[in-house]
Amino acid sequence: MLRVCPHTTAAVLINENYDRGLQKDWDDFLNRLAPRDRDYHHEDGNCDSHLKAALIGNSKSLFIEHGRLVLGHWQGVFLCEFDGPRRREVRVKIVAD
């Protein structure tokens, strides 16, 4: 299965889904790499959102076995919104063996 987010300021992430503190750690980490208030050349005021989405990526390939996603015990699939809230779309394509 292929999941694609056709937006340049949102991303698809596979990561731990148990400890909510990890979400805050991700936010802190990405904000250090691409702070919102930096003087960027991009004129729309959301360059940090584009950079964060590019770092994480807009697509992930996942396996399905017996009708279920194959993920680690603590893994989850997340849509990361960096320029919202706004309406987003995630496309899913299931490819046979």
Please tell me what each predicted stretch does.
Residues 1-97:
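Active-site histidine-anchored catalytic micro-motif
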